[in-house]
Each structure stands twice: as C-alpha cells, then as structure tokens.
Amino acid sequence: MVEPRLLSYDKMLTTNTRVGTRKDHRIIFTSHDVHVAHNDDNFAKFKYEEHQTMVSPLVKYNITCVSSFSLDYMHLVRLGVVRRILFFWKTGPHHCRLSHSQLTEVSELLHALTLPQEFACQTRSLFEVEWWKATEFQSFLLYTGPVVLKKVICKKSYETFMALSIAVGIMLEANAEERAAYLDYAKNLLSYFVCSSEEVFGETFVVYNVHSLVHLHEDNEHFQCSLNEISAFKFENHLQQIKQLVR
C-alpha cells in the first residue's frame, strides 16, 4: 500500500508542536522533526505559550480552538501543494525538474483533452501554470494529471502524485459512508506523500502547506463532511463585494 495571535497565525500551529527548520529562507518540516499533536484542552489551559500571547476569549464560550478551526482545502491543496508540485517540476531543483521535452509532452497531452461541460475550465499548458486557477489545479490533481503523467514522469514521482490524488479524492467524497470507509487509507496516503515528497523533491519542498496535509483528515472526522463543504472556495467569488463594503 502506498503507504489563528490569540489562536495562532495558522492552523498548523494550533494542531501540533512540531518545530520546523529554517533552510533557504523558508521553514521546512523534515521527517526527522519531532511531531506532537495539539489538543483543545491544553490550548484552553494556555499550555502552548510559544504560540499563544493570552488565553483566547473564545475559550470562555466553550469554543474549541484547535479542532473547530479547519484547514482550507482550496488554499492548502489546490493553490498550495498542487501548485507547488507543478512549479517544482517546471522551475525547481535540477534533480526533480522535468526536462523541456517532458513539459512539452505533458502540455500536448493536456491540450489533446476535451473536458465535459461540468468542468469550469478546459485544460491549459504547463507553460501557463502561473495563470492557472484553483479549479484547474483540482482538475489536474484528480482527473487529468493521473492520465497525462503516467508515461512521462518516473515511477516514484508518479506514485507520490497518485497518493495525494487518491487521498484527496477520498476526502472530497460526498457519500458519508464511502468516505468514512476509506478515510484511514487517505490518512496513510497523505503521510506517505509527505515523506515521499521529501525524497522526490528535496527537503525544501516540505513547507507548511505540505506538512499540514497530515492533519487534513481530522477536519473530515470532526465536521463529518466532505472537504468541499468546509472549503473557502464558494466564498471566493464574493470577496470583491466584501472589499467594497469595508472601504
């Protein structure tokens, strides 16, 4: 088997005490770092002083400040990890970068595909990845990527990509029974992806977004729903209206 400063500045700091390592002007989380999960009780008791400046007022209202704040699937996975994978393949370190001919082959295969009308966008070239939207990254992860990459990239890279693809597919499943049946498998796949991506792309790949994947299944379990139901995606098109109201 392919095995908020009251809260914290991000979900990851509210979910674990793992300390990253600074390298190449970024904080990375290697497989050698020690990981200890945060919990609601210790957060309410102000036991994470390195991440808390005071006891959150939310605690007074019995709001659980770790489990009740979900990771956002759209920014974490689509615009985070998947985008990072493609940028590493296109402009990353030499050991993991795809050749121009490989990029061209994948792009040509993408162009040859015609997606049904249920998809918001048709496929675009990897040479245009800087302008891809969140929906395009999802389509690549779940549908087109597994097809166009299979005979182009090496087996290890493909298995690593597929681990993420299958895990996310499970966590997006709308049927509660089917999702619950395979959630442990998705958890194992994400752990495999995080470890394997360090090997495939190098230590600098495993930044906050990548490491946070190991906590993604917790939101499925806590909220008892698909990641689609707790994603910021549905609100994205209304941000301009909110900006106009607060000017």
Located regions from the model:
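Generic hydrophobic, helix-prone segments enriched in Leu/Val/Ile
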Residues: 43, 80-90, 143, 164, ...
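Alpha-helix boundary/N-cap detector
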Residues: 72, 76, 97-101, 159, ...
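Hydrophobic, Leu/Ile/Phe/Ala-enriched alpha-helical segments that form helix-helix packing faces
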Residues: 110, 148, 190-197, 246
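Amphipathic, alpha-helical segments enriched in basic
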Residues: 85, 112-119, 123, 139, ...
